[in-house]
């Protein structure tokens, strides 16, 4: 019933698109009759009309799409089909176009990119890896340039490349920019650490199209991009608390929900902790670090498994990517969790680096004035797209009907029986010369099957998501006659598999998947490797009760039935009851996995709200300071007065000696206290006196920064230094706070409420600290000049 309703709604959306498609098609003959010069002149005409506000992008769409459509035929030899135009209309509207593999998403994206770039603001195409960004840029660049727009790759595609001064500005100073989500995210964070307006390089984030949009803003939505700073002071609690955690009993001292990745102390567990560490209440503010490390140690012990989430290599904890199965050397969990795992495994603790800046992909793309996306599997994530981003998903019809045969799952009790059956099936298909693509969840499984096939004299290509460019070429050849390719689920994504000569008659590409993935969208993506553009094809998933998804997400007793695993697999295969039960178990496990992931993303989104609002305000203030060309109207007296008033109310400043010490610490290293006692009798008089000392010291520094340019740079540097130091402290504190409270959702406190409450309190304290640090920087900094007579500021 739900599918029927969804199909009806999609049909209604397609009908609305048809009206605009007709308008585009109506202009086809007109554009076809244009000379090259006349067609190229359209871009300048469109820009002028938009600039004069004679039209809008929506009104211009039919004409602009018809223009680039005709240009594409002349420059690239490709004329976008009607279904591609429909997908392009959906994306200009800011929604998600679901387009199947091989339907030409790369060409489709050129239309909304061209239209939105006509405003004079940059339009971005964002994809998942460097290879795809570079490939699509190189293919489409001639089209944009022929039409008079500039296009660039937003990075230099050389490993460990060091950018020259102003090189980033040149890369981003284009109408259309191709880049990746990771590179754009880090560029955004670094751009907002610039200490001079000329050092900033990102253009206005106006419009973006995200390729593989579900992978980037759903699956990776809660993955934070982090710029790490100086090492934190290492806590000596990890080893002590590791021993404490080992004394705790599940259900009595702590509760555990593996599916939701939650673990928290019970009331009795809190009492045990109070007694163990000899404190009245571990949740008092002074014991924040104690609670933080207890929670980290509980998570390390019960939610992270050796050889599944990480393994020990050369005395170090090396993380494993659960999706690809690849190890991630050099990558570390944040906020002390990595150190908690190291303590658990008894290896040397690595440095826990502080966090300088962070943002999630979810918040990154919300910075754009508008963004849209394209994917082959958007419909399955439609609810979440709408709930999180207010995006509709429109399923675009394929240009040719899909005739791929998606067979029922083959089910087994044991994994070794399943693996044996998979190898036999590959041999059987290979004997006919039909190409086979065997897809696994992990690199380890892919290597196993590849090795076994070689032992059986079946040559094969192994792709385990290591060399993207090389693997893209290999996956493209997977449709050739007699080809056998073994691949992880992530390898070669974004590359079409075209059928070689004689393969169509054999039934197209055969896709065998060795287990269901944790997300049904990924299953569908993998099946979609076969049967592109109306080609024949076949796909089948093999499952067993030993599969990861069953062990991780199912609580079915059937999965633990040891007697079942002794039954002849052929008999089980012939049992409709067994097949139905196993499919039901796998289906439910996948549903639990998807719901849990969705809840985790919702939770991450809630946690991200506070830091997102704070980050926007801090970066807005940074930009205001960078863009200020004259500080003569800046009210430093009020700033100083706020700080002095706060400090006199909250610090122990009661007598002459306290005031003198305060002046030495905050205002002047050369203060002379001759007449201090006669001038200050009340708090207001003390504040007035401190403001007087502030102005006196500031004037001394102005004698050194003795022209308008030096004064401007000094004020900017002093204020930005204060903002950056305190904001870095705030970000790091919020990261640690999140790790500390994240476990308490089912405990005595509401984790989100507590997090936002403390985040607001620490933000308000940060504002005072920024003001104080600004005053201190203005007064106590030492100003010198380098050999080029440029001002150098040595901060206190």
Swiss-Prot record:
Membrane topology type: Peripheral membrane protein
Keywords, in A-Z order: ATP-binding, Cell membrane, Cytoplasm, Membrane, Nucleotide-binding, Protein transport, Translocase, Translocation, Transport
EC main group: translocase
EC number: 7.4.2.8
GO term, biological process aspect, one: protein transport by the Sec complex
Binding site for ATP: 84, 102-106, 496
Main location: membrane
GO molecular function, one term: ATP binding
Assigned GO CC terms: cell envelope Sec protein transport complex; cytosol; plasma membrane
PROSITE patterns the UniProt entry points to: SECA_MOTOR_DEAD
Entry's localization field: Cell membrane; Cytoplasm
SMART domains recorded: SecA_DEAD (SM00957), SecA_PP_bind (SM00958)
Catalytic activity annotation: ATP + H2O + cellular proteinSide 1 = ADP + phosphate + cellular proteinSide 2
Known role: Part of the Sec protein translocase complex. Interacts with the SecYEG preprotein conducting channel. Has a central role in coupling the hydrolysis of ATP to the transfer of proteins into and across the cell membrane, serving as an ATP-driven molecular motor driving the stepwise translocation of polypeptide chains across the membrane.
Complex and partners: Monomer and homodimer. Part of the essential Sec protein translocation apparatus which comprises SecA, SecYEG and auxiliary proteins SecDF. Other proteins may also be involved.
PANTHER family, alphabetized: CHLOROPLAST PROTEIN-TRANSPORTING ATPASE, SECA INNER MEMBRANE COMPONENT OF SEC PROTEIN SECRETION SYSTEM
NCBIfam families: PRK09200.1, secA2
Family statement drawn from the similarity comment of this UniProt entry: Belongs to the SecA family.
Protein name: Protein translocase subunit SecA 2
Source organism per UniProt: Staphylococcus haemolyticus (strain JCSC1435)
